[in-house]
Design a protein with these regions (language model features):
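Short, flexible coil/linker segments at domain boundaries that flank nucleotide/cofactor-interacting
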Residues: 5, 44-46, 157-159
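An N-terminal, well-structured beta->alpha segment
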Residues: 10-42
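Short glycine-/small-residue-rich Rossmann-like dinucleotide-binding loops
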Residues: 29, 54, 109-110, 242-244
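Phosphate/diphosphate ligand-binding glycine-rich loop within oxidoreductases
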Residues: 36, 42-151
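Glycine/threonine-rich flexible loop motifs
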Residues: 116, 171-176, 245-265
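Short, well-ordered alpha-helix to beta-strand connector turns
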Residues: 28, 102, 234-235
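Short, contiguous pre-domain boundary segments
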Residues: 3-9
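Glycine-rich phosphate/diphosphate-binding loop of Rossmann-like nucleotide-binding domains
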Residues: 54-66, 152-241, 248
């Protein structure tokens, strides 16, 4: 079992090796079982986590706050608008300040072409580990939860087919971080991963290449489809998700026009 995780940042899905991810999931299963049995596990007593949000959140905020409480620690919710960031505090300054006050820093910053760089700038200046609660490129913790659910529901995921399909939504251009993290992590576990989307909703080329490289190392397969029905055919796991056409346009109006062509997805 790989346990050399103390003090490590988790910003990209690839920051932890496959073996380290398996260790995290093993511990998570144990803690979930203990909680179901009423067994306390205050492993983070007297520890404090800063949760800095630039975007609203329901599930991520709730899960981090509940998790810290169940582990005996405290999660401090910090809306960026209530800080001095708007008055000039940089990522470096936030890293230096929060890194002194807190035992860990978790950040959600999803602005396109900004979020990941900001989180890394905080991490570079912080003496405490930095966790990515979603940026413009990755959403690693959500995908860990998804992977845990897959293990619980279907067992060993090797050889199972998952279809990650774009889904129409009339709201704003959502980040591409969820599908990108999905194809990165699922291809490390020997799954047959399908990415199904209209032509305008491509993901970042380097992320796609990493997913292909993972298949070469871990087995399984990876394919990109633009046929909605073909993506679902014979799949064991379905993962519909809306994301923006950000590699085609960052203009919200143009994005809405593109999306209106695919309301049946």
């Amino acid at each position: 079992m790989q346990t050399d995780l103390r003090g490590r940042n988790f910003i990209s899905d690839m920051d932890f090796s496959k073996e380290e991810i398996e260790t995290v999931l093993d511990v998570a299963h144990t803690l979930k079982r203990e909680r179901a049995l009423g067994i306390g596990h205050p492993l983070l007593r007297d520890k404090a986590l800063a949760m800095l949000f630039f975007f609203t959140s329901t599930r991520t905020r709730s899960s981090f706050e509940a998790g810290m409480a169940q582990l005996g620690g405290h999660a401090a919710f910090i809306d960026h608008e209530t800080t001095q960031i708007s008055h000039g505090d940089t990522g470096k300054e936030i890293g230096e300040i929060f890194g002194r006050y807190y035992d860990g820093i978790a950040i959600r910053q999803c602005d396109w072409d900004i979020g990941n760089g900001y989180i890394n700038s905080v991490a570079d200046a912080s003496r405490a580990p930095v966790l990515n609660m979603q940026c413009d490129i990755y959403h690693p913790f959500q995908i860990l939860a998804d992977l845990m659910t897959i293990f619980e529901k279907v067992g060993d995921p090797r050889g199972k087919t998952i279809n990650v399909s774009w889904a129409y939504a009339s709201s704003y251009q959502k980040p591409i971080s969820v599908p990108q993290s999905l194809i990165l992590q699922m291809t490390r576990f020997g799954m047959n991963v399908r990415l199904t989307h209209p032509p305008e909703y491509k993901l970042m080329p380097d992320i796609v290449q990493q997913a292909k490289d993972n298949v070469g190392q871990h087995g399984g397969s990876f394919e990109i489809l633009d046929d909605f029905d073909a993506g679902f055919e014979g799949a064991d796991i379905l993962y519909p998700k809306s994301w923006g056409a950000l590699l085609t346009t960052d203009d919200d109006e143009k994005s809405a026009q593109i999306g209106s062509q695919y309301t049946d997805w």
